[in-house]
A protein has these predicted regions:
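Sec-dependent bacterial lipoprotein signal peptides
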Residues: 1-19
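Conserved, well-structured interaction surfaces
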Residues: 47-48, 82-154, 174-184, 191-201, ...
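Surface-exposed intrinsically disordered loops and tails
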Residues: 179-182, 196-207, 251-299, 359-365, ...
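Alpha-helix C-terminal capping/termination sites
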Residues: 58, 148, 152-155, 229, ...
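Elongated scaffold/linker segments in the mid-to-C-terminal portions of large proteins
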Residues: 249-459, 521, 545-586
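Membrane-proximal, proline-rich intrinsically disordered regions
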Residues: 21-69, 237, 554, 560-586
Length: 586
């Protein structure tokens, strides 16, 4: 690998300082000053430098979704798919592929390094350090970016000083880390800042609209992810648990607030749209379009919002980076390049939709029934049937925020891409707890981990506990978002030997502790697909599960994109070799 070529390209435009902020992401060459020895000694310096980092961060946001989903099992290519995407899906990695440009990641890294190296965090105003928030933000973005690079490329060249001179670009002096080695380096760096605030600016827009801290990955969640990849499941579980219990508004709540009424589904979509399904009143749609990322964040990240961290995208290239993702999945003329896979449809249809009986419970027990042939309903929110003069076809409108028509062509845009949201934290907490159950040979913890899917988070803690007091009542299990009143189900969506035996096609008496752990793990893996599909996590989720279960776990899923009866044997054999999972560096 030619490491020098990777980072040497950063010498053009190492860092940007904005001289004004009419549009926070407009960093054109006529408005940029480069000063490699400049000390960031004012709050304005720190804010505008951080904005420069966010601009660079935008440029890798699409990559997060595309690399994470096109290589996974829930997305498939079609006749329109361009060569670069097709090669990704088939794991034929050409160094000239537009999606493999590692320099864009190092641009983010180098900008963060510059801010961290030059910011004066000792400056105080009213006895408060005024630039610490931006310092922590740079730490968080740098750590998250390094983690993504290690996951995608297998190893990452690691450096912490800004490269501003050609002599510094000889990176043979720098170490290369895989994700576990990287975790051992990053965790001690991040731990001292776990309780620090991220920036929450309020004076950059003429109308005073705030730019919230949700533009930055929380240190606590990055730590949770690093612990999870490292295999430190005790600390991973505690970190995720503490984030959820310390942030009560990060809980998914039942919309009704009563155990005797029907829970509603809750589907977070792109650009601030939310679709809900209330079976008592019929389907309703709540949709709010946000033309600017600043105003949009107020709505989507409010007290009841789903998103935790987002990357705002623009509607026009004149304003900044426009996401390619919506147009890859959506078209009215059957020109889209990516589809949901047949395996996604199979998985969704295999679920049981549970409908609680109406009225008051009898004898303290509420009845329920299964709705036949319904399956998980989340896929129906995301997939739209279309028809033109020639074809009937399906598209995915999960990412479409706005549509712009020019003549016969249409352009689809999205207001933001999501890095962290509540359901994802729930599911990673469940994964960590189940892995901890295996380490400690504690079946009760495995049942608790499954409970996060089935019952919600508050059931994990007894009444009167320090955590219970902070939790909202009647939190919603993740699986309920697509499958109804699953908390009532005592026959199918449960951890019982008979259910586990049927799940794996074995005799009840042969079910053992390992089967229980694997059953819960498989349910979590399936739920990650059902809940977070198309959002960028899928392939690396499969890699993480395969670290515990073997290469076949990943290979067998990805090779069955076209359905379990249509396994791609050549692709399966290729993916049994873990070296083929990772991207080449240019």
């Amino acid at each position: 690998m030619n490491k020098k070529s990777i980072i040497g390209l950063l010498l053009v435009g190492v860092l940007t300082f904005m001289t004004s902020c009419a549009d926070m992401f407009d960093i054109s060459s006529s408005r940029v000053v480069y000063d490699y020895d400049h000390t960031l000694g004012s709050s304005a310096d720190s804010v505008y430098t951080t904005v420069g980092i966010l601009h660079a961060f935008q440029q890798i946001a699409d990559r997060y979704v595309i690399l994470g989903e096109v290589r996974g099992d829930m997305v498939d290519i079609n006749k329109n798919t361009k060569a670069s995407l097709r090669n990704l899906a088939e794991f034929n990695f050409d160094e000239d592929n537009e999606y493999l440009q590692i320099r864009d990641y190092y641009k983010v890294i180098n900008n963060c390094n510059y801010l961290i190296a030059h910011m004066d965090t000792t400056i105080r105003h009213n006895n408060e350090r005024v630039m610490t928030d931006e310092y922590v933000a740079a730490l968080s973005i740098r750590a998250w970016t390094y983690m993504q690079m290690a996951l995608n490329y297998g190893k990452v060249v690691y450096y912490t000083n800004p490269i501003t001179k050609e002599a510094q670009a000889d990176v043979s002096k720098y170490p290369s880390y895989d994700v576990k080695e990287l975790a051992l380096v990053l965790i001690p760096q991040l731990l001292p800042y776990m309780e620090y605030k991220l920036p929450a600016w309020s004076d950059l827009q003429a109308d005073g609209a705030p730019v919230t801290s949700e533009l930055f990955p929380p240190i606590q969640l990055i730590l949770g992810d690093l612990y999870l990849w490292l295999g430190d499941y005790q600390n991973a579980w505690l970190t995720y648990r503490d984030f959820i219990t310390d942030n009560p508004n990060s809980l998914m709540r039942a919309q009704t607030g009563s155990e005797t009424t029907t829970f509603t589904g809750y589907m977070p979509l792109g650009n601030g749209q939310v679709k809900t399904d209330n079976r008592m009143t019929g389907r309703s749609f709540i949709a709010t379009n946000f033309p600017s990322y600043v105003n949009g964040l107020n709505g989507i990240l409010g007290g009841k919002g789903e998103a935790i961290t987002v990357v705002p995208m623009q509607e026009s290239t004149e304003d900044g980076t426009v996401s390619e993702v919506p147009g890859l999945f959506m078209s009215r003329q059957n020109t889209h390049q990516l589809n949901g896979s047949a395996l996604w449809q199979e998985l969704s249809l295999a679920q049981d939709y549970v409908l609680g009986a109406q009225g008051q419970p009898t004898g303290g027990v509420r009845g329920y029934s299964y709705l036949s042939n319904k399956g998980d309903q989340r896929i129906n929110y995301y997939v739209r049937e279309m028809q033109n003069e020639e074809d009937e076809f399906e598209v995915i409108d999960k990412f479409v925020g706005r549509t712009r028509t020019t003549g016969t062509s249409e352009t689809y845009t999205i207001g933001y891409l999501t890095l962290y949201r509540r359901a994802l934290v729930y599911l990673r907490a469940a994964e960590a707890l189940n892995c901890l159950a295996e380490q400690q040979h504690d079946g009760a913890k495995a049942v608790q981990a499954f409970g996060i899917l089935r019952d919600g988070f508050d059931i994990l803690f007894p009444n009167g506990s320090i955590y219970k007091a902070e939790l909202q009542p009647y939190t919603l299990g993740v699986h309920a978002r697509g499958c109804g009143d699953v908390y009532l189900d005592t026959a199918k969506y449960v951890v019982k030997d008979a259910v586990i035996a049927e799940f794996y096609g074995k005799e009840v008496e042969d079910v053992n502790f390992t089967d229980t752990i694997h059953y819960v793990e498989d349910r979590i893996c399936n739920e990650l697909a059902l809940e977070t599909t198309l959002e960028g996590n899928r392939f690396t989720d499969l890699v993480r599960f395969a670290q515990r279960r073997g290469a076949d776990y990943l290979a067998s899923k990805v090779a069955c994109r076209k359905g379990t009866e249509n396994r791609d044997e050549a692709l399966y054999q290729k993916l049994l070799n873990k070296a083929n999972w990772y991207l080449p560096t240019k």
